[in-house]
Amino acid sequence: MAAGTSNYWEDLRKQARQLENELDLKLVSFSKLCTSYSHSSARDGGRDRYSSDTTPLLNGSSQDRMFETMAIEIEQLLARLTGVNDKMAEYTNSAGVPSLNAALMHTLQRHRDILQDYTHEFHKTKANFMAIRERENLMGSVRKDIESYKSGSGVNNRRTELFLKEHDHLRNSDRLIEETISIAMATKENMTSQRGMLKSIHSKMNTLANRFPAVNSLIQRINLRKRRDSLILGGVIGICTILLLLYAFH
């Protein structure tokens, strides 16, 4: 009976790790899609500044389809991983040996933390993509209004020139923001690639921690320091973003 329940637990862990690996790859691709959309936005904005082309950016229909497809796939993987975590929680609640149950709860918490990180990363990347797309739609509408105004009868050239200069100023501000987003995306991708290597190391350290309490205490201190460093890094990125925004709009 014990062997059967142990096999069930290992099977759940195997499913969780497999889904986590799939999500990691999907999120990297999803992030690259958002980054490429942002870069193309800056390039196409410069080329179309004085044109009357109102075609959506980067063949928007295909770009949107790709975005929607990837978002659905990631949401499905997150739902499946949530289900596996729920089954693992049910198993830990039914485990009868206290020492074994504590070790299982530690492992379950680690998988829950990974799920929470992936969910947060997905929603953040999705929100960035939607913001860029909405801004491009707005700028496309502005360009169309400018061209309509220029082509109309009795156009006031001076007013049109001021309008175009203001539009250029907005475009330059957008470019600064997009560069900041690109830097943040590159940093996130680098951290994502390092996370894969740290996973295996962390798993081995957890195994040692379950056997040696002193190692467990050391791991907890390492985790606290890692969270502190993450908060510091996030604060620095936030301050840099605010400074760039202040510089762009003044």
Swiss-Prot record:
The keyword Zinc does not apply. Residues 38-59 are annotated as: Disordered. GO terms for cellular component: cis-Golgi network; Golgi medial cisterna; Golgi membrane; Golgi trans cisterna; SNARE complex. The modification Phosphoserine is found at S141. One of its GO terms (biological process) is intra-Golgi vesicle-mediated transport. Keywords: Acetylation, Coiled coil, ER-Golgi transport, Golgi apparatus, Membrane, Phosphoprotein, Protein transport, Transmembrane, Transmembrane helix, Transport. Residues 2-229 are cytoplasmic. It is found in: Golgi apparatus membrane. It comes from the Eukaryota. Residues 41-51 have a biased composition (Basic and acidic residues). It is a single-pass type IV membrane protein. The chain crosses the membrane at residues 230-250. The modification N-acetylalanine is found at A2. GO terms for molecular function: SNAP receptor activity. Component of several multiprotein Golgi SNARE complexes. Identified in a SNARE complex with BET1, STX5 and YKT6, in a SNARE complex with BET1L, STX5 and YKT6, in a SNARE complex with STX5, GOSR2, SEC22B and BET1, and in complex with STX5 and COG3. Interacts with GABARAPL2. Involved in transport from the ER to the Golgi apparatus as well as in intra-Golgi transport. It belongs to a super-family of proteins called t-SNAREs or soluble NSF (N-ethylmaleimide-sensitive factor) attachment protein receptor. May play a protective role against hydrogen peroxide induced cytotoxicity under glutathione depleted conditions in neuronal cells by regulating the intracellular ROS levels via inhibition of p38 MAPK (MAPK11, MAPK12, MAPK13 and MAPK14). Participates in docking and fusion stage of ER to cis-Golgi transport. Belongs to the GOSR1 family. PANTHER family: GOLGI SNAP RECEPTOR COMPLEX MEMBER 1, GOS-28 SNARE- RELATED. This is Golgi SNAP receptor complex member 1. It comes from Cricetulus griseus.
